[in-house]
Regions:
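Positively charged, amphipathic and often flexible ligand-engagement surfaces
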Residues: 1, 8-242, 845-852
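Hydrophobic face of amphipathic alpha-helices that form TPR/SEL1-like repeat modules
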Residues: 187, 194-309, 327, 739-744, ...
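Glycine-rich loop-to-alpha-helix module at the N-terminal edge of alpha/beta enzyme cores
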Residues: 291, 295-296, 301-394, 681, ...
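Short, well-ordered beta-strand elements within core beta-sheets of diverse protein domains
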Residues: 294, 307-313, 328-333, 517-520, ...
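Substrate-binding/gating loop at the entrance of the active-site cleft, primarily
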Residues: 398-451, 763, 767, 774-777, ...
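ATP-dependent adenylate-forming carboxylate-activation enzymes
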Residues: 437-453, 466-472, 521-523, 650-654, ...
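ALDH superfamily catalytic-core signature
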Residues: 453, 458, 480-481, 485, ...
Length: 883
């Protein structure tokens, strides 16, 4: 449906036939001329049918900054014309056609401009053409008052707009005021030069030249829109590159892309008459259909339609899968990084080609909305291109050897069934490892679908195997000696169970989150509400990064206007079946969420700003819910919930809010809504979370733009973020070349200064700053064993000192290192292993000189949720300082 058709729907009703209506046309849009064409056709047809004329208000453009920012963030072409001269020329071109009598009679014209040259041209042209009676001049009160007074003396019809705001709504007007000030002080804006303007001056000639240049261009200017993305067309492959460019999401404003969505629905919305697809079990290059299969029912059709069935592996079949991955019969580990880079780019291109099917599968299997599914596909494509690109910085280090670890097990979640598992498998494959993907069973068909992109791109099926299992067979996977590293995205309890059942196998896990946004009295409340509801209720509140806590400074908390607006924003979100593309909030993955159901009960002092409402008979679809008056310690304050429920807490000031957020066990994402730079600095320097967001939503991290990972119980492993420059280095073995002559002191200092010391923004987007920074560990202990050499200890100690990380060194009785290590300036402690195990809880990280350490250390670290960095130290600081 076109813009004109959308606007025409109400006034096409018979009862409005004799009413006029107006619409704004913005000349800075290349397709404004085509829009005018549609508008003229509609207005003339309406008048021919006896209807009243319509009106077109012609402006230069209202939202240049917003359009530019959105384009920058989404990777879309800027929809506005590239220069003011082009905009002015288009304005004159549209104006000339608008003032033709046969057009102006049906579509009256409002000339909205303060530019004296434009006004004079419109005045003279309308009289020449005889259409002045259908034209009005439109100006703002208080701007160029002398111009409208002169127009009145000429008998022109002038409409003056005077912004009016009530005291209690003044904050709503500030953004309008700022926009006007910004526009009116721009160097090429007419009003900037309008004061004391006189003919013959340099300023006059500058403005005259502006107009004349636009006049010369008006009849030759093109009207081709810049936004031409068309998902109906085949995907345009992107060749391998050394710099990854983020994949643009779908522009759903475009009619052709809306048709594409309808095609997706036609293919993927199954009916009871459709036979469900049977997905086999993959064992290397072979497939087998198992008797035990998981059925996938469409939640948006009341669980009455089976989408597909997927075969589940038993323990014996899992052993075969492990054996194939360990032996690597296809020789994936022997491929070069450049070969893998080329294959990953080809896989990304194939993912781009299957975007529609991936979205359709997510809609049918997991209840994802089209928009949420679309950004997942873009993220998956980004992972496929970024990780081999990021590996190159390590491959180019002159004095290290890099080798794959072996087999990587990737266990992925249901809430991001496309992007996160793709990220995990590419992280493993990029280093030359074989990968076994165990996706969340409830979302596994999505993984089966995207795995085909990798196989077809050149990844051997023996190098990438996809499997779902029962609980017993899963334990075989997670405890197998053949698995050299486990990548998990899932619950904190799952990470703890895996770590404790197999403590010696490295685990990199992104786990739970109890994420909060703090809104202070210095925040832009309208903007904050927009960010809050998007973060809380997107994907039905099931993102691990979702905002489930809102901490509001008392003056805002008690403001009835704020409460009403938050309530209105939550209740205005469209909720329901994902097969309706207008719905923003779809179903939850399960209707057996005991934690959420308990949180939907009120505790003392709590009330509902927006009470819970289930909209379907099986209770998958919960409308956005807002609980008011939640206190620290309440169940919904401290418990991670997967559902569209927001808990609102009153705080006295920002510091109290920071303290409350930091008191939580988790530290995944966190947000601040405040325009006060002092508050921003305090919050940024104090909050304990992996991803921090100021004056924007706290979900939707983008690869390489906002690498993702948390702190505390939100992360297990070395704390290296997914989607960041160091992630792939976790899944390879990096060692000094034999006979390395690197001066590690110089290398560490250089690496610290170039990579680790300063926050940096590698994207440089318009309208958003993304600062990537490294934080030093609070403290670390190095445990030495008799076989460790003192030089390794000195390397680790130097790296810690350069990174400003306090280091203690512990060693066995009888293995006295005091004399050899006294010069390091670290506390030295001679203690038995039993004593050291008791002290491990006091350190943020434990460091060793190798992985061959007592099993008791691994077991204790798993029990107390600590990470042991066991990599042998290397002389290259770009590698060593990561630990």
């Amino acid at each position: 449906m076109t813009g004109v058709q959308t606007c025409a729907l109400p006034i096409c009703r018979p009862e409005f036939k004799n009413y006029s209506a107006g619409i704004v046309v913005q000349a800075y849009l290349p397709d404004a001329y085509e829009f005018q064409t549609e508008l003229l056709d509609f207005a003339k047809a309406r008048m021919a049918d006896g209807g009243a004329p319509l009106k077109m208000r012609l402006v230069k453009g209202c939202n240049l900054e917003m359009e530019t920012v959105i384009s920058s963030l989404r990777g879309w072409p800027n929809p506005v014309r590239t220069s003011k001269t082009e905009v002015d020329a288009n304005y004159l071109h549209i104006l000339e056609r608008a003032l033709l009598p046969e057009n102006a009679k049906a579509l009256h014209v409002g000339v909205a401009s303060h530019n004296l040259f434009t006004i004079a041209y419109a005045y003279l042209l309308s009289r020449k053409l005889g259409s002045a009676e259908y034209m009005t001049f439109e100006m703002l009160e208080g701007m160029a008052d002398h111009v409208w007074r002169a127009q009145s003396q000429l008998g022109n019809h002038v409409i003056l707009y005077a912004p009016v705001v009530k005291d209690e709504h003044f904050l709503n007007a500030v953004s309008y005021l700022v926009r006007r000030m910004d526009e009116n002080t721009a160097p090429d804006n007419f009003l900037t030069h309008s004061f004391n303007l006189k003919p013959g001056t340099d300023t006059w000639r500058f403005l005259q030249n502006q107009f004349e240049e636009a006049y010369k261009m008006k009849d030759v200017i093109t009207h081709i829109p810049t936004r031409t993305q068309n998902r109906l067309h085949r995907y345009t492959p992107v060749p391998p590159a050394d710099v990854m460019k983020n994949e643009p999401d779908t522009d759903f404003d475009l009619a052709q892309n809306q048709e594409w969505v309808r095609n997706i629905f036609a293919k993927w919305k199954k009916s009871p008459a459709d036979s469900p697809e049977i997905i086999p079990l993959q064992i290397g290059a072979e497939t087998v259909v198992c008797e035990k299969r998981h059925k996938y029912m469409d939640r948006c059709q009341d669980d009455e339609v089976c989408v597909c069935e997927m075969s589940q592996a038993d323990a014996g079949q899992v052993m075969k899968i492990l054996e194939i991955a360990e032996k690597d019969p296809a020789g994936w580990r022997k491929t070069t990084l450049q070969e893998r880079h080329k294959i990953m780019y080809e896989a990304a291109n194939r993912l781009g080609e299957m975007r529609g099917d991936l979205i359709g599968c997510m809609c049918a299997v997991t209840g994802k909305t089209v928009v949420e599914g679309d950004v997942e596909v873009s993220e998956g494509i980004d992972y496929a291109r970024f990780y081999t690109t990021s590996m190159k910085q390590f491959a180019e280090l002159p004095d290290v050897d890099i080798a794959p670890k072996g087999t990587i097990l990737v266990i992925s979640p249901w809430n991001f069934p496309c992007a996160i598992p793709i990220g995990g498998i590419v992280a493993g494959l990029a280093g030359g490892n074989t990968v076994i993907l165990k996706p969340a069973t409830v979302a596994a068909p999505v993984a089966w679908l995207f795995a085909k992109a990798f196989w077809d791109a050149g990844v051997p099926k023996e190098a990438l195997q996809v499997v779902i299992t029962d609980r017993e067979a899963l334990k075989v996977l997670t405890t197998a000696p053949a698995v050299k590293h486990i990548i998990l995205t899932g619950g904190t309890d799952t990470a703890q169970n895996i770590a404790r059942s197999n403590p010696a196998t490295p685990l990199s896990a992104e786990t739970g989150g109890k994420n909060a946004i703090i809104l202070t009295a210095s925040g832009d409340r309208d903007h904050a509400i927009m960010n809050i509801v998007a973060s809380a209720f997107g994907n039905a509140g099931q993102k691990c990064s979702a905002c489930s806590l809102l901490l509001v400074e008392r003056s805002v908390y008690e403001d009835k206007n704020f409460q009403d607006k938050l309530k209105d924003a939550a209740t205005s979100m469209k909720v329901g079946s994902v097969w309706n593309p207008g719905n923003v909030v779809g179903p939850m993955i399960t209707n057996k969420n005991d934690k959420l159901l308990k949180a939907l009960e009120l505790e003392k002092g709590e009330s509902w700003l927006v009470p819970p409402r289930f909209l379907d008979k099986h209770k998958y679809v919960l409308a956005p819910t807002v609980k008011w008056g939640v206190r620290p310690g309440n169940y919904s304050f401290r418990t991670e919930l997967f559902g569209p429920m927001l808990s609102v807490v009153c705080i006295e000031n920002l510091q109290q809010g920071i303290d409350l957020v930091n008191s939580l066990e988790y530290g995944l994402t966190s947000g601040l809504q405040s325009l006060d730079e002092g508050e921003q600095k305090l919050w940024k320097d104090s909050i304990m979370a992996g991803n921090l967001y100021i004056n924007r939503g706290i979900t939707g991290a983008i690869v390489n733009r906002q690498p993702f990972g948390g702190m505390k119980l939100s992360a297990f492993g070395g704390g290296v973020k997914a989607g960041g420059p160091n992630y792939c280095a976790c899944f390879v073995n990096i060692a000094d070349k034999p006979g390395s002559t690197t001066d590690y002191t110089q290398s560490y200092v250089k690496a610290y200064e170039q990579e680790f010391a300063h926050a940096r923004d590698v994207n440089n987007l318009y309208g958003e700053q993304n600062a990537f920074r490294y934080l030093p560990l609070k403290n670390m202990v190095l445990r030495l064993f008799p076989g460790d050499n003192n030089e390794d200890a000195k390397m680790i100690a130097l790296a810690a000192r350069i990174c400003h990380t306090p280091l203690s060194i512990s060693f066995e009785p009888g293995d006295d290192r005091t004399a050899a290590l006294a010069s390091l300036g670290c506390p030295l402690k001679e203690e038995a292993l039993a004593g050291f195990l008791k002290s491990m809880k006091n350190y943020e990280r434990i460091r060793t000189c190798g992985a061959d350490i007592p099993m008791e250390m691994y077991e204790e670290a798993a029990r107390i949720d600590k990470y042991i960095a066991t990599a042998k130290p290397v002389k290259d600081g770009r590698v060593e300082l990561i630990h």
